[in-house]
Amino acid sequence: MSSNQQPVVLGKLGSCHGIKGWLKITAYTDSVEGIFDYSPWLIKENGEWREIKVTQWRYQGKAVVALLDGVETREQAQMLTNCEIAILPEQMNDLPADEFYWRDLIGCEVVNTTGYNMGIVDQIVETGSNDVLLVKANAKDSFGKVERMIPFVPEQFIKTVDLQGKQILVDWDPDF
């Protein structure tokens, strides 16, 4: 299964809350509430994904807790502690042409405007001013680099993003 078909992890189930099956939620979405915009969820339990619906959620102090369909006791909830929460890729919102999901950029080849292959996007780091591509350099990098950090600033450094071809064209000196 390609990375674009893999479930998209949005968070994980935390510890139990109370005796009626409530679980604390750790959300990786921009806002904690954002994870509840998606339904149904996929829960990875014993290495297998299964569909589950949230029947209720609420703030509990500074935490967010949820009650899942079919989970009615603390014991049932304990079985789900630390399970990942995901959705299918087709559940994600469509983006404007000039915006990208990070997961789609990971694995893209990065080439500069002179044709030099800078490496592969390994991860993306969120900073205060802009996101930064962490590019794992090729084993035979001419400049002896192991990785490069390239600011994701469209037009200035990021010239084109070809998701179909899995390639990002950058205006970046390979010696940086």
Swiss-Prot record:
GO terms for cellular component: cytoplasm; ribosome. Residues 97-176 form the PRC barrel domain. GO terms for molecular function: ribosome binding. Keywords: Chaperone, Cytoplasm, Ribosome biogenesis, rRNA processing. Pfam families: PRC_RimM, RimM. NCBIfam families: 16S_RimM (TIGR02273). PANTHER family: RIBOSOME MATURATION FACTOR RIMM (PTHR33692:SF1). Binds ribosomal protein uS19. This is Ribosome maturation factor RimM. It comes from Shewanella baltica (strain OS155 / ATCC BAA-1091). The gene is rimM.
